[in-house]
């Protein structure tokens, strides 16, 4: 009986490995078709399988490690792309789930030892929340605020912290024509800045040298900058050639960006999910 069990188990593993290999081949083929190196990246911190789930939404950095958000999780990864320094796989507090229907973490931002996370009741859009986590442990600090849903009318897909000006930025999650500004300490609404042009499907942002760098999931998953004072929008580059829209997000999905000057000369670090949602890519770009 044991010999038969081992034969069956071995056959199952071989079939399973073959299926995974086939799916990865398909995923890489589709990725190659869409990721046409419109603007070349220098390197790619890539993961497959289950790790994709925990690196599927947002990214930020403190200059010493990467912080990723999944749909309901936070994880801190060393720059070697392998060593897990901290994790919180149930990052959405139970009280948020019970009281507000919270189900989704978006594009995150690091500031002064804390991770600021946007949390929403996905597809309901009634309770957009800013929640604060300890960057060392990724544990929830207890600090949070429900933002006004007459301003944040379609949930909260991203936020970016601006330490210098004491602000948090966000926008409409599908068609951003305005930049919403909140106080970094109290989370109270401060002002709205009109944008010079619409940014489609913003997924995350980071403030660097006075500009907000935005990662989008528009037709080319473009990266933009926004001047938070004037509202001027500038496209930096396209990440793919064109997204075929017969099937939504066919070919993968553009996600968050973080900005930090690395020793290899890269500055913009842009997250995307590959075709078939089997791989997560953090692509590192040089930018002047």
Residue ranges of model-derived segments:
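Loop/turn-rich, solvent-exposed surfaces of beta-rich toroidal or solenoidal domains
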Residues: 197-229
